[in-house]
Amino acid sequence: MTLPDRRRNLLSAIGFASVLLAVPARSTSAEMKFFDFSGYSYLSGPPARVGTVTTVAAKFNTIQPNPVWSLELLDKEYTVMIRDLTIASVDASGSFQVITYSGGTVEVHADPAKNASWTPNPPNNAVPSTFLDGGADLIGVFTEMTLYFSTDSGTGTLSGLVNWEGGSRRAGMANPFGWTVFGGVSNHDGLGIPIGYDLAWDPQMYGPEVPSPVEIRSWGAVKRAFRR
């Protein structure tokens, strides 16, 4: 399954179950910069357990409407590697979970080799290494991260903030702090999740100017949204 096909299936699978639980406010600004990526997560232990570490291996999607910088998508493969996101707490009510994380880093790499591969049962000789070769464009740290997930539907929404601390592109950013991470996740079989991976991820990262602020709904509102 190609990445665009997988992404279309993910968006369909998420459906209303991942309705904006943490909603970026709309903006009329024409200067919104963001990058869009898709991939898969894998875990160091059981899901939804405090102490389990989440790792995400992802690639930039081929369509980037308003990228942060001019991308060489024909010549390079852009990969995103999220590591060390550690589950700090799990708030569960029936099939609904709010999972908060501590720590976590994110790196964006550009590699002309275009060799990134979601080899089954990570970590292995291809993951994370083929997502970390090439030059490091951005290196950041998470200041917060939350996953809202329904075990009944197998879908959810993630929301977080990142500060960019390094990488060759950081110096050219107007504001490297407070970038919003927002998107959907799913464990549906039709998404082609490789063996040994947990969820399909389809997030975006937005510059700090937009969307702002991020509206976090109450736990009651989260449950009501899933039940509709």
Show where each model-derived region lies.
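Extracytosolic secretory-pathway proteins
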Residues: 29-216
